[in-house]
Amino acid sequence: MIKKFTFPILIFCSFALLACNNSANSIEPSTVSSKKDNLEVHEKLNAKDQEIVNEYNQATDLITTGDVAGFHHQIKALIPQIKTISDDKQRNLILMNVYTQLEMNQDAFDLNEKLLKKNPSSDKQEFQCFLLKQLNKKEDLPTCYETAAGLLKKELSHPEAKKNPDYPYSQWSYYFYMYQAGHTEYKEKMLNLIQSTSDTKIKSNLQTAFDDEILNK
């Protein structure tokens, strides 16, 4: 799995979910993607689950009208029902969307912690670090980023990883995690990577990330 470039971190996912009964959204917590890009084959939800998903989707329509307060009110009221969805992936996805939209950071942290224990990934771990910042638990950040770096290093050890054109982003993310974990020598590694990158678009993106996440902090 190649780490997508996600700086600054955007924590909310696409609003519309499950427009069709036979589709599912597979967005990682720390990644923003369109519904179209994340559709995959999925067994049909049972009638009760689908009814709840439909209610959530209807609530998201308020965003298009600019009624953010109304949207927040409706999705908060739906939380007890969302928790009864039997499909694990859809329940967790929608709950995470709701928690992040309502800035229920402790609830998002607790849910993400459960997801990490079940299926660890650098994306989820990165999101956990973000939530620690939101919860003002800065003392836990070095360990969190160290763990994220370890997970990403394992993901990048797969033979196909370096063949992916997005590999420089993943490599930069690893250096960034290590820097955030307290290994200050990785600042120089980030700069060297930027300077050695030949692709102008990637180079520009990496430089912007460095400026935003390192220089301007």
Protein language model features and the residues they cover:
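Sec-dependent bacterial lipoprotein signal peptides
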Residues: 1-18
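N-terminal leader/linker segments that initiate helical-solenoid repeat arrays
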Residues: 20-90
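Flexible helix-coil transition and linker loops at the boundaries of alpha-helical arrays
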Residues: 40-46, 79-89, 114-118, 150-165
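Generic helix N-cap/helix-start motif at coil->alpha-helix transitions
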Residues: 45-60, 84-94, 119-127, 165-172, ...
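Structural motif corresponding to the intra-repeat A-B loop/turn of tetratricopeptide repeats
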Residues: 65, 102, 135, 180-183
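Alpha-helical repeat scaffolds
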Residues: 71-80, 105-116, 139-155, 183-197
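Terminal, low-structured helical/coil segments at or just beyond the last alpha-helical repeat
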Residues: 170-217
